[in-house]
């Protein structure tokens, strides 16, 4: 059974079409009108080996906030839908990613309980036109709508682009690990019998 989801979401602030294949090869087609986010989502898909299509339009004449947050919402919903009852998945994933002077650790638990820990102090507030604080908004929206614990910890780093990039690569790799299916599992990875 293919683990896929396709979602269309329209609000007064954004219009988003997203298609996800969990068991992909890292192919992506991303057009969000936020170039730095496009770059991060390409990296996420490639390093997580997810096939991902995102087309988004938003009120970027105001700022990027609504577009970035709403894409996090839709991506989280897509993972939740594609994983279904989560039978057979490993559930946990972690990745420690270097990017030159930066080292970031990302851990996920597909528990059904949304929670974000974001220990990422950024040395400046912008990467080009992108407000660096929006990375946190994206991850919070994802965790809330996927229903997962998501922990991002920056061990060290100086370049804000490298820091956010290491976080997105680690996000992809940790989700790849957590969504893997293990033939030894019957049901879900929980003594409760449900995730």
Curated annotation (Swiss-Prot):
According to its UniProt record, in which pathway does this protein act?
Answer: Amino-acid biosynthesis; L-histidine biosynthesis; L-histidine from 5-phospho-alpha-D-ribose 1-diphosphate: step 6/9
Protein localization: Cytoplasm
Q: Highest taxon of the source?
A: Bacteria
- GO BP, one example? L-histidine biosynthetic process
Which cellular component appears as one GO term in the record? cytoplasm
Whether Cytoplasm counts among this entry's keywords is yes
Q: Which SUPFAM superfamilies match?
A: Ribosomal protein S5 domain 2-like (SSF54211)
EC top class, as a word: lyase
The record ties this protein, via InterPro entries, to: IGPD_sf, ImidazoleglycerolP_deHydtase, ImidazoleglycerP_deHydtase_CS, Ribosomal_Su5_D2-typ_SF
Q: Keywords for this entry?
A: Amino-acid biosynthesis, Cytoplasm, Histidine biosynthesis, Lyase
Entry EC no(s) = 4.2.1.19
Quick check: keyword Transmembrane helix in the entry? no
Main subcellular location of this protein, as a coarse class: cytoplasm
Q: Which GO terms describe its molecular function?
A: imidazoleglycerol-phosphate dehydratase activity
Q: Name one Pfam family in it.
A: IGPD
Q: Which HAMAP family match?
A: HisB
The family classification in the record reads: Belongs to the imidazoleglycerol-phosphate dehydratase family.
Concerning PANTHER family, the annotation shows: IMIDAZOLEGLYCEROL-PHOSPHATE DEHYDRATASE, IMIDAZOLEGLYCEROL-PHOSPHATE DEHYDRATASE HIS7
| Protein name per the record | Imidazoleglycerol-phosphate dehydratase
């Amino acid at each position: 059974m293919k683990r896929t989801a396709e979602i269309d979401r329209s609000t007064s602030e954004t219009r988003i079409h997203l298609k996800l294949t969990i068991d992909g090869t890292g192919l992506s087609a991303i057009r969000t009108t936020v170039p730095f986010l496009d770059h991060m989502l390409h990296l996420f898909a490639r390093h997580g080996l997810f096939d991902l299509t995102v087309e988004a339009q938003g009120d970027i004449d105001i700022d990027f906030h609504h577009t970035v947050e709403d894409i996090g919402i839709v991506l989280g919903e897509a993972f939740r839908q594609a994983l279904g009852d989560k039978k057979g998945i490993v559930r946990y994933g972690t990745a420690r990613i270097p990017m030159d002077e930066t080292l970031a650790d990302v851990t996920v638990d597909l528990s059904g309980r949304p929670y974000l820990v974001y220990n990422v102090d950024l040395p400046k507030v912008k990467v080009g036109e992108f407000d660096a604080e929006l990375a946190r908004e994206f991850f919070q929206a994802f965790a809330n709508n996927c229903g997962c614990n998501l922990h991002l910890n920056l061990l060290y780093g100086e370049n804000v682009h490298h820091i956010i990039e290491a976080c997105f690569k680690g996000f992809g790799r940790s989700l790849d690990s957590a969504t893997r299916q293990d033939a030894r599992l019957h049901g879900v990875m929980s003594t409760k019998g449900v995730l």
